[in-house]
Amino acid sequence: MLAAGHPQREAFLAGLHIERLVLNDAGAVLSGAALDRIGLYVGETPTFNTLDEARAMVRSRLVTFGAHTQDQWDFLTDAVLRSTEDGRWRLHYDPAIAAPFKAALLALNGPTPDADLWPLYDAIACPTLLLRGAESDLLPRSVAEDMTQRGPKATLVEFAGVGHAPTLLNEDQMGPILSFLAEA
């Protein structure tokens, strides 16, 4: 959706053909309060003495992802952790990813407003599957329902017991995606 709003959109999209689109708990309006929540920790670079300590912190941030087995939690957390030369643990991502986000928050000088992406969503022209965690704070239910009536008129699938965002590790989450993509 962001490409649709880029100044060089036509050049970017030339020759690009998307047959089917899956949106995972991201919609035409993103909750400003949820963006504020994410802004509290994006860009942080904590280090941890043990892998268990690092896993516990990451898991506490991902609690909205819903129920998972211990192996699934280890998979999710280990993917974002790396050991350091001194035997400690750190998050594995570029903290500079937060710079534009934090600059935008500072420029607002107050609560973050909802991000209105309706013009971008309405420009989507392919069949679209919209996945939503039933307790998502980023994608309000009313927006998800509106997305089934506008633009590509997405097919909405919600997952109980999940917030932002479904991890797509469980069969009940993968099944709808596989079925949707098989329709192509």
Roles of regions detected by a PLM:
Residues M1-H6, E10:
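Hydrolases whose catalytic domains are alpha/beta-hydrolase-1, hotdog thioesterase
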Residues G163, P176-F180:
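A generic "structured core" feature
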Residues N49-A104:
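Conserved alpha/beta-hydrolase catalytic His-Asp/Glu region
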Residues E145-A154:
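Active-site-adjacent alpha-helix of alpha/beta-hydrolase-fold enzymes
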Residues L23-A26, E135, F159-G161:
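Active-site loop/turn elements of alpha/beta-hydrolase fold enzymes
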Residues F12, L16-E53:
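Flexible "cap/lid" loop of the alpha/beta hydrolase fold
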Residues V162-E171:
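Catalytic histidine-centered segment of alpha/beta-hydrolase-like enzymes
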Residues T84-D146:
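Conserved serine/cysteine hydrolase catalytic core
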